[in-house]
C-alpha cells in the first residue's frame, strides 16, 4: 500500500516541474509597440492599471518593471500580490515569484489554504522544499486547524526523512479526528520506511544551495547498509547545514555502524542546538559507551533515549541487553539502581509488545478480507502499550471498513474508550512502570575525548596486527557427488523450476552426517519429499554408506525408509547405547530411527514418544539439555496446521498467485522432550516453562555451550519473528527459559526480527568466546553476532564488512569451516530464492554460493572462487549445507541440497600443507555425545576454542567432531576439555594430522584412519 503522502509528493514535484518548464517567455517588442504600450501606460490613473494594461498588451517586461509601485500600493492585498507573482513567473523570475507567493500568504495571515498551497507549489518548483516546510509551519502556528496544510507538512517531513517532526503532526491530525491509515502507520516506526529519493534529488537539482532533501537518499543508503556512501552524503549536508539535527543524528548512527569511534567523538563536539532532546542522540551515545565497556553509562543513555521516545524498539532491546550485562559484571551498580526486581520483565514485555505491533503493522493491508481482525490485534496491542488515542483511532477507522464483522472490534473500541479522558496523554503512564525509571543512580553519559582506545575498552578482538595478518588461501571446491556414488535428488515438488511455489515447498530438504556402522568413514542421511503433507506419499529418504570414500545406497537394506514429507535431520545417540540414531523431521509425523548396531535401523517412534503429533517440523537436535546424563530432544516447528499446503496468496502488484508469507499462518511452538529412565521421551515444554511469550517460526537450531556458563544452550533461528535462546536452570521445577532479547540475539542491530534460517558457530575472532552467524532473507543482511561478554552478543555485521554482500540474496544453510587449516575459520553460505521473482525485479531465483574469509584481524571479504570451480561459478537454489570429511584427508568437505538439482558433495581441494587434528568426545558421567562440551587447544603461541554442538543450523547435522587447523603446526598440542557437568581434563597430544578420541576421565587415544572410535 503506497502512502498517499508519497504519491502526493511525487505528483506535486512533477506538477511544479511542469509549470517551471512551460513558463511563457517575454516576447520581443518592436519599437512602435513599446512606444504604444508606454503611451497607454501613461494614460492610466494607477500603477495597477498600468501594469495590467502592459500585461494585456503582451509587454511582460514592461509590466514587471511597473510592479514595484503596485506592491508598495497594495502591501496587504494577497490577490494583487499573487497577480504580481504570476507576472514574475511569466518573466522567468521563478524565485521572485515564489517569494511573492509567500508574501501573499502572509498578507492573508495564512488563513486561506488556497494561497498556502499556491505558494508551496511555487517553492517546490524552484526546489526550496524547506522554505515550503517553514511556510506550512507558520500557517499551522496561526491556524492549527488548517488540516490540509498539516497533511502536506506531514508528507514533506516524512519524505525528507525527518520522522520525529512528521510523527508529531500525524498525532495532531489523529487527535483532531482526521484519521487516515497512512498517519496511523507512520507512528512509532522511527523512520523505518521507504523514502521517495527521486523527488528529493529533483529538489537539490533545482536549488543546490539546500542539500537537506538529500537526507532521503542518505537514509536509503543506510537502509541498504551503504554506510560509506551515506557518511559522505551526510557530511556534505551537515557541512552546509550544521544545525539540521535529523542529518546529524543519522550521521552519528552511521559512524557507530562503521565503528568510526574517533570520528564519532569529533562529531559529538561539533553538535549544536537542542540535540539532547532527540532520542537518537542518546541511542548513539549509548552505543559509544557500550563499545567502551562503560555499561552503566550505556544503560543510562539507552534509558534517556526511551524516555524521549518510548516507541522505538531498538532503544528497548539495547537497554535490555546492557542491563542484563550490567547485572552480570557489576552487581553493585545494578543493585544501586534501586529499580524494582521485575524491571527486566517489564522491559521484555515492552519489547515483545512493540515487536508484535511492528509485525502487525507491516502485515496490515486494508484490502485484506481479515483487515478488521488485524485492526483488533493492533488496537489491543496499542492499548496494552498505553497508547490509547492511537488504539482508539485504529478501532474507529476500522469500523468504517466495508468487509468483516465488527462485533469484536466494537467491543475492543469500547474497552479503550472507557480508559480515555480528555486529559489522557498520548503515552499513558498508567500500568507502564517501565516508563518511570529513576536514572539518578546511573552515571551521567557524555562523550569524552578518547583517542587512545586501549584493549580494556575494546571488544573487537585482535587475532594479530593487521599489518602482519596472513589471509587464508582461496578455497578450491569440486563437486564430486556423481564420481563417488552420491546420486540423490530430494525435493519438495517436481515443478520447482516454475513460478508459483507454495510456502510448504519452499524450504527444501536437508540431511545429516553420521557414522552409523562405526567404521570411521562418515555416512549420509538425505531427506526427500514431493508428496502432500501430512500424508506418507513422498519419495523416500536415503541412507548412503561411505566405504573408503565412495557411497553406496543402503536405504532399503538398513530399514531406514520413511515416506513422510521430509525436511531436516538430527543425529545423536538418543538411547545412550553408543550408536548414532536419527531423528527425521517431517511436515507431518516425525520419526526416530534407532541404530541397531548391525547395519539396520528400527522405527521406535511410537514406543519412544508418549505423545506424538503431526506438525510442521523443520530442524531438531539430540542433546542432554538438563545434564542428567540422558540425551533429550528439541524439535523446531514452523507454521501451525496444514493450511499452508493448500493456500496461495495473490500478489497485489501482479495479481499472480504466489507463496504466502509465513506470517500469514499461525506460528507453531517448538517442543522440548526429556528422556526419562524408562526410555520414553516426555514433552516437558510447559513443565520447563519453555514456551516463549512470542512464538517463532523455527527453521534452524544449534545446541551447545554457547556462552561461558556451565550447561547447554539452544539458539533457534526463526523466520520473520524473533530468534529464541534457551538455557537450562536446575530449579524446582526446572526452567528452560527463553532470553534471546536479553542476550542480544533476538534480531538485528535495530531490534528488527528477520527471516532467519542458517546458523554458523565458531570463535571467529579468537577471543575464546563463541560467535554466531545467522543467514536471513533478501534485503536483510546475514547477521554476525559477536559474543561480547560471557553471555551477551552484539550485532557487529557492518564492522565486519559483512552487510552488503548478503543483502540481495536469500541465505539458507551456512557453516564455519577452516578450508586451508591455517587456524582461521571461514564462512560458507548457500543461497537461493524461495520462488521466481516477478519479471520486473532484479532478483534471481538461482543465486551464488558465497565464501567469506578474514582479510584483516577484524574484517571479512568475499572470496572470488576460481573459474575452474564449475559449482562455485554457477548459480543454484541452495537449501541445507553441512560439513564432513568424507575422504578423511583432514580437509573438511561440504554437502549442499537444492531445489532444482541433485545433492552436491564439494570436495575440499584447497592446496595446503597445513596440519590439523580432529577431536571426538565421549561422555561417561555426561551424556555419551557430550554436547555442551568446550575444547581449547594451545600450540606454540596460538590458542583456539571450539564448542561441540548438535543441530548445526538449517535442516542438518554436521559430522560429530571438532576440527582444528594448526597451520605449520608445533608439538606438543595442549588440549583441555570442559565437560557439560563442569569438570575439566587436559591432555598433551604428540601427533597431528589425525583423529583423537577423548573419553571423559580417560586418556586421549589416537584413532587409526580405519575407525573413528564411536563405539569405543
Where do the language-model regions lie?
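Alpha-solenoid helical repeat scaffolds
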Residues: 48-49, 79-83, 113-118, 148-155, ...
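Register position in tetratricopeptide repeats
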Residues: 56, 90-91, 125-126, 159-160, ...
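Short coil turns that delineate tetratricopeptide repeat
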Residues: 75, 109-110, 144, 175-178, ...
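Repeat-based blade/solenoid architectures
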Residues: 373-374, 486-510, 537, 558-570, ...
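Gly/Ser/Thr/Pro-enriched helix-cap/hinge segments flanking short amphipathic alpha-helices
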Residues: 376-378, 394, 689, 801-804, ...
Amino acid at each position: 500500500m503506497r502512502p498517499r503522502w508519497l504519491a502526493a509528493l511525487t505528483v506535486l514535484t512533477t506538477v511544479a516541474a511542469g509549470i517551471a518548464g512551460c513558463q511563457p517567455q517575454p516576447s520581443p517588442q518592436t519599437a512602435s509597440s513599446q512606444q504604444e504600450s508606454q503611451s497607454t501606460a501613461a494614460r492610466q490613473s494607477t500603477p495597477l492599471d498600468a501594469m495590467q494594461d502592459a500585461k494585456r498588451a503582451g509587454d511582460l517586461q514592461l509590466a514587471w518593471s511597473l510592479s514595484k509601485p503596485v506592491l508598495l500600493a497594495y502591501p496587504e492585498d494577497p490577490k494583487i500580490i499573487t497577480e504580481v507573482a504570476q507576472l514574475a513567473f511569466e518573466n522567468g523570475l521563478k524565485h521572485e515569484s515564489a517569494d511573492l507567493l509567500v508574501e501573499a500568504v502572509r498578507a492573508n495571515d495564512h488563513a486561506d489554504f488556497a494561497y498556502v498551497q499556491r505558494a508551496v507549489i511555487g517553492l517546490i518548483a524552484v526546489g526550496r522544499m524547506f522554505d515550503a516546510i517553514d511556510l506550512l509551519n507558520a500557517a499551522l502556528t496561526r491556524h492549527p486547524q488548517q488540516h490540509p496544510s498539516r497533511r502536506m507538512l506531514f508528507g514533506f517531513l516524512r519524505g525528507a526523512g525527518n520522522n520525529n517532526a512528521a510523527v508529531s503532526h500525524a498525532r495532531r491530525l489523529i487527535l483532531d479526528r482526521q484519521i487516515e491509515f497512512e498517519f496511523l502507520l507512520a507512528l512509532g516506526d522511527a523512520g523505518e520506511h521507504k523514502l521517495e529519493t527521486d523527488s528529493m534529488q529533483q529538489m537539490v537539482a533545482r536549488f543546490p544551495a539546500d542539500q537537506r532533501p538529500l537526507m532521503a537518499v542518505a537514509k536509503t543508503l543506510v537502509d541498504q547498509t551503504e554506510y560509506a556512501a551515506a557518511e559522505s552524503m551526510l557530511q556534505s549536508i551537515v557541512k552546509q547545514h550544521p544545525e539540521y539535527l535529523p542529518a546529524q543524528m543519522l550521521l552519528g548512527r552511521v559512524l557507530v555502524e562503521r565503528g568510526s569511534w574517533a570520528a564519532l567523538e569529533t562529531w559529538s563536539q561539533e553538535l549544536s542546538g537542542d540535540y539532547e532532546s532527540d532520542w537518537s542522540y542518546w541511542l548513539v551515545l549509548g552505543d559509544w559507551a557500550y563499545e567502551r565497556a562503560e555499561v552503566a553509562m550505556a544503560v543510562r543513555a539507552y534509558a534517556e533515549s526511551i524516555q524521549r521516545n518510548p516507541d522505538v524498539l531498538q532503544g528497548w532491546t539495547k537497554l535490555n541487553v546492557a542491563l542484563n550485562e550490567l547485572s552480570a559484571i557489576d552487581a553493585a551498580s545494578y543493585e544501586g539502581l534501586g529499580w524494582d526486581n521485575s524491571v527486566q520483565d517489564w522491559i521484555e514485555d515492552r519489547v515483545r509488545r512493540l515487536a508484535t505491533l511492528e509485525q502487525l503493522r507491516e502485515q496490515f493491508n486494508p484490502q485484506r478480507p481479515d483487515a478488521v481482525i488485524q485492526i483488533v490485534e493492533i488496537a489491543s496491542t496499542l492499548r496494552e502499550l498505553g497508547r490509547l488515542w492511537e488504539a482508539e483511532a485504529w478501532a474507529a477507522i476500522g469500523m468504517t471498513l466495508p468487509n468483516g464483522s465488527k462485533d469484536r472490534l466494537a467491543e475492543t473500541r469500547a474497552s479503550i474508550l472507557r480508559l480515555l479522558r480528555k486529559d489522557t496523554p498520548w503515552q499513558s503512564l498508567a500500568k507502564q512502570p517501565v516508563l518511570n525509571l529513576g536514572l539518578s543512580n546511573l552515571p551521567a553519559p557524555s562523550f569524552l575525548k578518547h583517542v587512545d582506545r586501549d584493549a580494556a575498552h575494546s571488544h573487537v578482538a585482535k587475532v594479530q596486527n593487521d599489518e602482519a595478518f596472513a589471509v587464508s588461501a582461496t578455497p578450491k571446491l569440486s563437486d564430486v557427488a556423481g564420481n563417488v556414488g552420491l546420486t540423490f535428488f530430494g525435493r519438495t515438488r517436481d515443478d520447482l523450476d516454475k513460478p508459483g511455489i507454495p510456502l510448504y515447498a519452499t524450504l527444501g530438504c536437508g540431511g545429516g552426517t553420521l557414522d552409523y556402522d562405526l567404521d570411521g568413514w562418515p555416512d549420509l542421511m538425505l531427506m526427500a519429499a514431493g508428496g502432500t503433507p501430512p500424508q506418507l506419499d513422498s519419495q523416500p529418504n536415503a541412507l548412503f554408506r561411505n566405504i573408503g570414500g565412495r557411497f553406496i545406497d543402503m536405504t532399503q537394506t538398513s530399514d531406514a525408509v520413511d515416506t513422510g514429507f521430509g525436511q531436516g535431520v538430527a543425529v545423536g545417540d538418543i538411547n545412550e547405547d553408543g550408536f548414532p540414531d536419527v531423528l527425521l523431521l517431517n511436515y507431518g509425523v516425525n520419526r526416530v530411527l534407532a541404530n541397531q548396531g548391525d547395519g539396520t535401523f528400527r522405527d521406535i517412534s511410537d514406543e519412544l514418544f508418549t505423545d506424538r503429533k503431526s506438525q510442521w517440523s523443520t530442524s531438531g537436535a539430540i542433546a542432554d539439555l538438563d545434564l542428567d546424563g540422558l540425551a533429550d530432544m528439541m524439535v523446531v516447528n514452523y507454521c501451525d496446521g496444514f493450511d499452508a499446503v493448500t493456500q496461495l496468496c495473490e500478489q497485489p502488484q501482479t495479481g499472480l498467485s504466489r507463496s504466502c508469507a509465513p506470517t500469514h499462518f499461525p506460528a507453531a511452538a517448538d517442543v522440548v522432550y526429556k528422556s526419562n529412565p524408562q526410555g520414553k521421551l516426555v514433552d516437558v515444554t510447559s513443565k520447563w516453562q519453555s514456551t516463549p511469550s512470542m512464538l517463532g517460526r523455527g527453521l534452524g537450531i544449534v545446541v551447545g555451550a554457547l556462552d561461558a556458563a556451565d550447561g547447554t544452550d539452544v539458539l533457534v533461528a526463526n523466520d520473520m519473528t524473533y530468534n529464541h535462546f534457551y538455557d537450562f536452570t536446575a530449579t524446582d521445577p526446572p526452567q528452560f527459559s527463553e532470553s534471546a532479547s536479553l542476550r542480544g540475539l533476538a534480531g538485528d542491530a535495530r531490534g528488527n526480527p528477520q527471516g532467519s534460517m542458517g546458523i554458523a558457530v565458531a570463535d571467529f575472532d579468537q577471543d575464546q568466546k563463541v560467535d554466531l552467524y545467522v543467514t536471513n532473507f533478501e534485503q536483510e543482511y546475514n547477521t554476525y553476532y559477536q559474543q561480547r561478554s560471557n553471555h551477551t552478543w552484539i550485532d557487529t555485521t557492518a564492522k565486519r564488512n559483512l552487510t552488503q554482500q548478503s543483502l540481495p540474496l536469500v541465505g539458507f544453510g551456512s557453516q564455519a569451516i577452516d578450508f586451508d587449516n591455517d587456524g582461521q575459520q571461514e564462512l560458507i553460505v548457500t543461497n537461493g530464492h524461495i520462488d521466481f521473482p516477478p519479471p520486473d525485479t532484479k532478483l534471481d531465483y538461482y543465486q551464488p554460493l558465497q565464501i567469506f574469509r578474514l582479510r584483516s584481524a577484524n574484517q571479512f571479504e568475499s572470496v572470488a572462487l576460481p573459474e575452474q570451480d564449475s559449482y562455485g561459478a554457477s548459480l543454484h537454489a541452495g537449501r541445507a549445507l553441512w560439513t564432513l570429511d568424507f575422504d578423511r584427508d583432514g580437509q573438511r568437505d561440504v554437502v549442499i541440497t537444492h531445489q532444482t538439482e541433485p545433492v552436491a558433495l564439494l570436495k575440499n581441494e584447497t592446496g595446503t600443507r597445513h596440519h590439523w587434528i580432529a577431536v571426538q568426545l565421549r561422555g561417561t558421567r555426561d551424556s555419551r555425545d557430550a554436547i555442551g562440551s568446550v575444547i581449547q587447544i594451545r600450540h606454540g603461541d596460538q590458542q583456539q576454542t571450539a564448542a561441540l554442538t548438535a543441530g548445526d543450523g538449517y535442516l542438518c547435522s554436521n559430522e560429530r567432531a571438532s576440527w582444528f587447523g594448526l597451520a605449520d603446526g608445533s608439538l606438543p598440542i595442549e588440549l583441555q576439555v570442559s565437560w557439560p557437568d563442569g569438570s575439566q581434563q587436559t591432555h598433551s597430544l604428540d601427533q597431528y594430522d589425525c583423529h583423537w578420541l577423548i573419553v571423559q576421565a580417560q586418556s586421549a587415544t589416537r584413532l587409526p584412519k580405519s575407525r573413528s572410535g564411536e563405539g569405543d
